[in-house]
A protein has these predicted regions:
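Ser/Thr/Pro- and often Gln-rich low-complexity regulatory segments
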Residues: 2-558
Length: 558
């Protein structure tokens, strides 16, 4: 073939490919952002090992409003590496613990006693800060368990509610706190319903309600377990499963809107596990509230079958989809991560940005179904230009694969733990069971920022605030910059299987900032508008100044 013919052929193929892409995306008009050159690894941020072993692998975690973290695994695999205290009743002759209570402030832990199996379960904090933990496997799949925080580190333990059971089994389900304080429990393996806790005959919520969307999103690999669930400021739910998403009125059981399919071939829910968050809700006196959902990672169609039956590990998803759900005509903005990732955890930072952490570059969730751990977290800068949002951060030395977790702590660190891609505890081979806890310290904790780091002195409303209440937050710092401070509420999510249930950030409306002394100021703000914006319960309150957050203090919203 002559060079002219070769050139014509290349141009023809290129144009054909371009027009094919345009035709594919014409229907949903989604936008794909061309990525900028990969960011270099930044020196900011560092890792620290907190505990080389807590005796169990962290499959589920929940931060409590007394700076304790409840961590638990499953009970059906045999003994763990942590014994129950002498004299404790041993369920099934297993005298080892499958749950611990970790004290953030003292970096200590103690064993807790679980009776029924919590394997792949779900949970939420109620409005009083009590963990309502639901479902699991086998004899635990209909169970409701509670954990009530207590002042003494040694006096709390699990309580199983034998008189109150779930209507349907809940294994791989998702929970969310609602504006009235109830909790919705949605989905699960081969369960296409939702229900509420607590049960109430008067409200007629003592039964489960069928949801066709859960049937429609199930494929041969399932790919709709642990559906992503976000409460929106209009009081409705955003539900995402597989590649599909809807706006759902749970009170009337009506689908109000079907959003466009997220573009591409990647599936986003278990076992092709991605993650999702509701981006920060910024309350202000000007302009409408912007409501956006971010979905990142996952695996291509068919990836689970290849990994699980043939041990062929295809590359994970490289894309994130961002959807402004309250637009008149919502369309996905697709962005390319610098590293492919399945089983990512997504953690909202007090700055309003997102850390994407944990997971693998090939394979899916499941028993020994992933390889090539992704050791580098990635910072997603929410307000940067679309092609400049990702920054690769310093790596951990510890792979965190299937059944690993990550969540924000009040001082701004990220607690990271777990990883057990095996059916039991295995401490040999390529990716052994991981019992350690570590923390990733983001760049903003560097001492060089101490002069502009705010420190909360007091909260005018005390330990609680009413909806819409105006209140003051006194804070101190050395170098104050006018107009550079805001206050934000961060909810403590229940985290498992790469999804932080109830994860939420609300930037409070600012009235004014008043200088009290040379180095002390008062930020006057308004409490959240209502329970749609911030469901009742405990939040971490942060003051952020020039992009540097204070340590968080606990505030109850009622």
């Amino acid at each position: 073939m002559s060079s002219k013919k070769q050139s014509f052929f290349v141009i023809f193929v290129s144009l054909f490919f371009l027009f094919s892409l345009l035709e594919i995306n014409k229907a949903n008009r989604s936008v794909f952002v061309t990525p900028s050159p990969p960011s270099s690894i930044v020196s900011g941020g560092y890792w620290e090992l907190l505990q080389s072993s807590i005796g169990i692998s962290a499959m589920h975690v929940q931060l409590l409003p007394n700076n304790k973290v409840i961590i638990f695994d499953r009970t059906d695999f045999g003994p763990s590496n942590l014994s129950l205290p002498y004299g404790t009743y041993c369920p099934g002759n297993d005298c080892t613990a499958h749950s611990v209570l970790y004290d953030v402030d003292s970096n200590t832990f103690r064993p807790l006693r679980l009776v029924t199996d919590t394997f792949c379960s779900s949970g939420s904090l109620d409005h009083d800060g009590i963990l309502i933990q639901t479902g699991g496997f086998s004899q635990g799949d209909h169970l409701i368990r509670t954990f009530t925080p207590c002042d003494s580190f040694d006096d709390c333990d699990w309580n199983e509610l034998n008189q109150s059971r779930l209507v349907d089994r809940r294994w791989y389900a998702t929970n969310h706190v609602l504006p009235d304080g109830r909790i919705i429990i949605l989905g699960g393996r081969r369960v296409f319903t939702y229900e509420f806790y607590p049960k109430d005959d008067f409200l007629n919520n003592n039964k489960s309600i069928y949801l066709q969307f859960l049937v429609e999103t199930r494929d041969p690999d399932e790919n709709n377990l642990y559906p992503f669930l976000h409460l929106l400021p209009d009081g409705n739910l955003f539900i995402f499963a597989n590649k599909n998403s809807i706006l759902f009125d749970y009170k009337r059981s009506i689908v109000l809107k079907q959003f466009p399919l997220i573009p591409g071939d990647d599936k986003r829910n278990y076992p092709s596990t991605g993650s999702s968050i509701l981006l920060p809700l910024r309350l202000s006196s000007t302009g409408p509230l912007v409501v956006e959902v971010l979905v990142c990672g996952g695996a291509p169609s068919g990836a689970f079958l290849k990994a699980d039956t043939m041990k062929i590990y295809v590359e994970a998803s490289r894309t994130c989809g961002r959807l402004r759900v309250n637009d008149q005509d919502p369309q996905w903005l697709m962005e390319f991560m610098p590293i492919p990732r399945v089983m990512p955890d997504m953690v909202l930072l007090p700055t309003g940005d997102v850390i994407i952490i944990n997971g693998a570059a090939n394979g899916t969730a499941g028993w020994e179904d992933a390889v090539n751990p992704v050791l580098n977290p990635v910072l997603y800068s929410v307000n940067e230009e679309p092609d400049r949002r990702f920054t690769v951060l310093s790596p951990s030395k510890i792979p965190r694969l299937y059944h690993s977790v990550a969540m924000l702590l009040p001082e701004g660190r990220i607690l990271v733990g777990g990883s057990n891609p095996h059916t039991s505890y295995v401490f040999t081979g390529l990716y052994p069971t991981e019992l350690s806890l570590e923390a990733y310290n983001p760049y903003y904790l560097d001492p060089k920022f101490n002069s502009i780091r705010p420190s909360i002195v007091s909260v005018e409303s005390g330990s609680s605030v009413l909806y819409g209440q105006r209140f003051g937050i006194a804070f101190s710092l050395s170098l104050y910059k006018q107009g550079a401070a805001f206050a934000a509420l961060m909810s403590p999510p229940f985290t498992t299987h790469s999804f932080g249930m109830n994860q939420r950030m609300v930037v409070l409306k600012t009235a004014s900032v008043v200088q009290l002394t040379m180095f002390e100021y008062k930020l006057l703000v308004y409490g959240p508008t209502n329970g749609n914006v911030a469901p009742p319960g405990y939040y971490m309150l942060f003051v952020v100044h020039s992009g540097i957050p204070s340590h968080g203090v606990w505030l109850k919203v009622t």
